[in-house]
Amino acid sequence: MEEKVHRESSMIYITGDTHGDFTRFSAKRLRRTGMELTKEDYIIICGDFGLCWAKDKTFEYHCKNFAEKPYTILWVQGNHENYDMIGEYPLEEWHGGKVRHIIRDKVILLERGQVFEIEGKSFFAFGGASSHDIQGGIVNVKSYAYP
């Protein structure tokens, strides 16, 4: 029988550039890497998350899936994001900075230029960049195959 390790505090994991490939967040895959995430834990995605691209069935599927995860995903905008769609969500205060709750308290966009206090640590959200693969940094959402 496996013995569960008791942790005294939450964990903060950092990754980036998921580009809509959310298989790395499956419980089975996380367990294989030794990660047993709880409701106190956070995963910070440093840009190009890929969730908010179009409000379609895929978006709804992933929203439902992430809402059922025990942990919270925090995400900073990258250069491949649908900024118009993100802008539809209201700005709110959270842990000292401005955020947009994309999926209730499960997926939270950390606004650029903000400082957040999370578990006694300070995090500065510095996201976005010019797109080397999109002319002028402007994309027609309907013509771009994302992810």
Q: What residue spans do the PLM features occupy?
A:
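Core catalytic region of metal-dependent phosphoesterases/phosphodiesterases
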Residues: 2, 7-8, 15, 20-118
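Active-site-proximal loop/helix segment associated with metal-binding centers of metalloenzymes
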Residues: 105, 119-147
